[in-house]
């Protein structure tokens, strides 16, 4: 009977588990002066489209910074890696991003939680080509999520 390479089995299992783990994305936006109302319109449009078309988006919210009227924060919770890739490729999101660059000075994206290496590579390429700064805060493995809610 051949022996199993348990290290390799463990590595492959962790890839599957990582791709199916919920995580948080924060996008920090700074709108150009005089464009706040226009920006709020495109934010509302994309929010409605995401709600209708993305079941893997578990939470999607756009908040204003209390200390700066030009700054806003998207808070998004994704069911898994595939939900993020779907979001990036969703046509209404693409339209929003195009309009964003007309109405805003900047956007910076932060992700908190586990992501598969292939997902990080994909989003680094997509956001890098659009000059969108991205930072992945890797988990320390201290923390949890409730399977009953997310899976």
Language model features with spans:
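A short, acidic, amphipathic alpha-helical segment used as a generic capping/interface helix at domain edges
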Residues: 93-98
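Short S/T/G/P-rich N-terminal loop/turn motif that feeds into the first structured element of a domain
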Residues: 1-72, 79-89, 103-151
């Amino acid at each position: 009977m051949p022996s199993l390479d348990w290290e390799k089995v463990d590595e492959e299992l962790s890839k599957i588990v990582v791709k199916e783990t919920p995580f948080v994305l924060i996008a920090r936006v700074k709108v150009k002066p005089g464009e706040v109302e226009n920006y709020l319109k495109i934010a509302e449009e994309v929010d409605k489209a995401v709600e209708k078309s993305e079941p893997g988006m578990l939470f999607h919210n756009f908040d204003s910074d209390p200390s700066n009227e030009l700054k806003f924060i998207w808070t998004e919770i994704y069911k898994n890696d595939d939900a993020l890739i779907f979001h990036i490729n969703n046509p209404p999101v693409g339209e929003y991003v195009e309009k964003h660059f007309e109405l805003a000075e900047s956007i910076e994206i932060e992700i908190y939680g586990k992501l598969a290496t292939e997902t990080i590579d994909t989003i680094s390429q997509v956001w890098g080509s659009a000059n969108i700064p991205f930072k992945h805060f890797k988990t320390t493995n201290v923390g949890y999520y409730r399977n009953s809610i997310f899976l």
